[in-house]
Amino acid sequence: MSGTILENLSGRKLSILVGSLLLCQVLCFLLGGLYAPVPAGHTNVLGSLCRENHARQNDTSFFLYSRGEGSCTQVTREEVEQDSMKLANQIVHVFQMPLPRDSRVLDYSRWQQNLIGVLQVEFGYDSSSELREPPKELQLTIDMRLAYRNKGDPDHAWKLYAHGVEHRYLDCVAAHIGSSETLYTCDMIPLFELGALHHSFYLLNLRFPLDTPKQMNLQFGHMHDLTLTAIHQNGGFTHVWLMLKTLLFPFVVGIMVWFWRRVHLLQRSPALLEYMLLYLGGALTFLNLPLEYLSLTIEMPYMLLLSDIRQGIFYAMLLSFWLVFAGEHMLIQDSHNKSTIRSRYWKHLSAVVVGCISLFVFDISERGVQLRNPFYSIWTTPLGAKVAMSFILLAGVSAAVYFLFLCYMISKVFKNIGDKRTSLPSMSQARRLHYEGLIYRFKFLMLATLLCAALTVTGFIMGQMAEGQWKWNDDVEIQLTSAFLTGVYGMWNIYIFALLILYAPSHKQWPTMHHSDETTQSNENIVASAASEEIEFSNLPSDSNPSEISSLTSFTRKVAFE
């Protein structure tokens, strides 16, 4: 058996390969750290007060806007305070995005990919009113209308994007207690999420209807300032991200084709680890596929959901691969039967599959519904917020437990290797040099696997927390830097690229020795070559199981020979 490239590649060639891959890894970090802007940006938009047009109040094709020709009649804060009813049912809160800068009209770019809106509410209670403070879990009913227009359209040509009457629950605290009124400020509430930022301008009209028979919004005093925080992906980061995907995609596809071609040239069926490497490469290829280019010409509101699905498939495959990878190198083979998923790893992989399916169901329950109603959010109710927070915490804990279990498996691998190294002194010098070289290479690869797993788990936990921090309104601020994102993404590609090369079958043919004098001469040649950097870790004559892809996995069944 010729073994793998990891076993047969010379020390100098292996050093060049590892050095080149490490250089690529550094470049991925530098690309995000020096060239790319922060991944996401946000703008705070203070709502404008426009007087309601009662004749067209129920017309969903009519919108009030605060800038441009034909803008609404705006109401000042003083007018609201002087009115005994605080202009109830006569005010529309208007948010026009994006804001102008230095008297220049700005527009959104499709490179910014998506848009998320969260709302900060402030309201007050008069000292003379019967209700002095908001009740716990105060429910707010909001009539939301989201519209859009594009460059070149007239100022009044707003078109309906989505409309809904939604409920939000507020948790408020007193911000200022005065003689005439008490001002309350509330936690941020999720308002909308757009999976595609396809249009140039967006407009949001918010109404807070008061209805006594329906007991609608009667427990509020009167609204003060409403601040909308619009969060979007930075276009410059999208440029860098797509450039990285575009560069990596053909390399991974090419190395997969090369790897599978070498496997099929062998006179045996592919081993389990070779199948897992192919599946892992396929999942990475699906993740690398730069589908985001399509969103520059086609409106794809499902892009966020599709991105989550692609990343989820990759995570599931990567986590499964690491379990099989460590398990196949535990050097404990109870039988000569070929390893299969069903026979050896179904318990471990079942936990990974159940966890990934649970996260998929959680994701589809929110972003799937948002394809039809962008105002929907699982975080809008107290129960939903607790469930969502529990899922995030559970996902983080599960990722940490998985990493600890992987560390345990790899430690068992190292322990088994250490136990078997005690048999090396009884071997011939040639065989001892052969296996010592393999062990050093293998340990380096396993440590690289642990580092990759640690960064992957860290990135997953930070990503979950960063996504939820705008929704749970915690004081913890998490900013995933561009260098970390591009570095980890490049690391996945480089790591899998290296595995496909190093675990590809080596086609070097070594002569089989039949006589003791020939064997002695061969061993002397290997010992002599060990002093140079160009030592080739060839497979010594043995009765290895032909189904194994690495001679290291058959180490336990080797007998010392002189």
From Swiss-Prot:
<dbReference type="InterPro" id="IPR047843">
    <property type="entry name" value="WLS-like_TM"/>
</dbReference>
<feature type="topological domain" description="Lumenal">
    <location>
        <begin position="366"/>
        <end position="386"/>
    </location>
</feature>
<feature type="glycosylation site" description="N-linked (GlcNAc...) asparagine">
    <location>
        <position position="58"/>
    </location>
</feature>
<dbReference type="GO" id="GO:0061357">
    <property type="term" value="P:positive regulation of Wnt protein secretion"/>
</dbReference>
<feature type="transmembrane region" description="Helical; Name=1">
    <location>
        <begin position="14"/>
        <end position="34"/>
    </location>
</feature>
<dbReference type="GO" id="GO:0017147">
    <property type="term" value="F:Wnt-protein binding"/>
</dbReference>
<keyword id="KW-0325">Glycoprotein</keyword>
<comment type="similarity">
    <text>Belongs to the wntless family.</text>
</comment>
<keyword id="KW-0472">Membrane</keyword>
<feature type="compositionally biased region" description="Polar residues">
    <location>
        <begin position="539"/>
        <end position="556"/>
    </location>
</feature>
<keyword id="KW-1133">Transmembrane helix</keyword>
<keyword id="KW-0879">Wnt signaling pathway</keyword>
<dbReference type="GO" id="GO:0001745">
    <property type="term" value="P:compound eye morphogenesis"/>
</dbReference>
<feature type="topological domain" description="Cytoplasmic">
    <location>
        <begin position="1"/>
        <end position="13"/>
    </location>
</feature>
<dbReference type="GO" id="GO:0030672">
    <property type="term" value="C:synaptic vesicle membrane"/>
</dbReference>
<feature type="topological domain" description="Lumenal">
    <location>
        <begin position="292"/>
        <end position="311"/>
    </location>
</feature>
<dbReference type="GO" id="GO:0099157">
    <property type="term" value="P:trans-synaptic signaling via exosome"/>
</dbReference>
<dbReference type="GO" id="GO:0006886">
    <property type="term" value="P:intracellular protein transport"/>
</dbReference>
<protein>
    <recommendedName>
        <fullName>Protein wntless</fullName>
    </recommendedName>
</protein>
<keyword id="KW-0966">Cell projection</keyword>
<dbReference type="GO" id="GO:0008587">
    <property type="term" value="P:imaginal disc-derived wing margin morphogenesis"/>
</dbReference>
<dbReference type="GO" id="GO:0031594">
    <property type="term" value="C:neuromuscular junction"/>
</dbReference>
<dbReference type="GO" id="GO:0005789">
    <property type="term" value="C:endoplasmic reticulum membrane"/>
</dbReference>
<dbReference type="InterPro" id="IPR009551">
    <property type="entry name" value="Wntless"/>
</dbReference>
<dbReference type="InterPro" id="IPR053936">
    <property type="entry name" value="WLS_GOLD"/>
</dbReference>
<dbReference type="GO" id="GO:0070062">
    <property type="term" value="C:extracellular exosome"/>
</dbReference>
<dbReference type="GO" id="GO:0050714">
    <property type="term" value="P:positive regulation of protein secretion"/>
</dbReference>
<feature type="topological domain" description="Cytoplasmic">
    <location>
        <begin position="408"/>
        <end position="441"/>
    </location>
</feature>
<feature type="topological domain" description="Cytoplasmic">
    <location>
        <begin position="333"/>
        <end position="344"/>
    </location>
</feature>
<keyword id="KW-1003">Cell membrane</keyword>
<dbReference type="GO" id="GO:0007367">
    <property type="term" value="P:segment polarity determination"/>
</dbReference>
<feature type="transmembrane region" description="Helical; Name=2">
    <location>
        <begin position="240"/>
        <end position="260"/>
    </location>
</feature>
<dbReference type="GO" id="GO:0005886">
    <property type="term" value="C:plasma membrane"/>
</dbReference>
<feature type="transmembrane region" description="Helical; Name=4">
    <location>
        <begin position="312"/>
        <end position="332"/>
    </location>
</feature>
<feature type="region of interest" description="Disordered">
    <location>
        <begin position="538"/>
        <end position="562"/>
    </location>
</feature>
<dbReference type="GO" id="GO:0000139">
    <property type="term" value="C:Golgi membrane"/>
</dbReference>
<dbReference type="GO" id="GO:0042734">
    <property type="term" value="C:presynaptic membrane"/>
</dbReference>
<dbReference type="GO" id="GO:0010008">
    <property type="term" value="C:endosome membrane"/>
</dbReference>
<feature type="transmembrane region" description="Helical; Name=7">
    <location>
        <begin position="442"/>
        <end position="462"/>
    </location>
</feature>
<dbReference type="GO" id="GO:0045211">
    <property type="term" value="C:postsynaptic membrane"/>
</dbReference>
<feature type="topological domain" description="Lumenal">
    <location>
        <begin position="463"/>
        <end position="482"/>
    </location>
</feature>
<keyword id="KW-0709">Segmentation polarity protein</keyword>
